[in-house]
Amino acid sequence: IRSAKVSTELHTALVDAIDHVRRFNEALRLRLTDWSIEIEPGARVGEKLTPITSVGLFIPSGKASYPSVAYQLAVPAVVAGVARIAVMVPPLPDGSGNVDPAVLVVCRLLGIGEVYRANGPAGIAALGFGTQTIAPVRKIVGPGSPAVTAAQVEMQRHGVATMMVLGPTE
């Protein structure tokens, strides 16, 4: 992560985009508050907002570079106070085994040090079930191919929360 490099122009654009998304999410977080009401003497109902303990972010790779997906998913988790954020990125299709350096720069800018390289469904399974080196997460978010979506749906069957099923345009 530390050695990832992008052009000065892209770095500046990523810093600005992260700032914008952070400011929006911080404003949103201020508007979301705990609340409760007493519906009858001694009986209260309401909502208490607490961050989940861990989240896995799947950042697609392949036909294009998607650092925007990285900051759009990671910044809300950072602002919410999620204690552990794990990022899963498929390797670039050039056969080098490397991952998109722009995604690594986003992770570095946000202080995320837990980044793994694996293809779609295998990466989703690793985040959901865990491996010898990857602890399982409570929730997995991120768009992907139909196979990635199917893997996320399968994780739901095993008690891992995921977001709504997304297509390529969401």
Regions found by a protein language model. Name each.
Residues 2-17, 47, 65, 95, ...:
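Catalytic cores of large soluble enzymes that bind and process phosphate-bearing ligands
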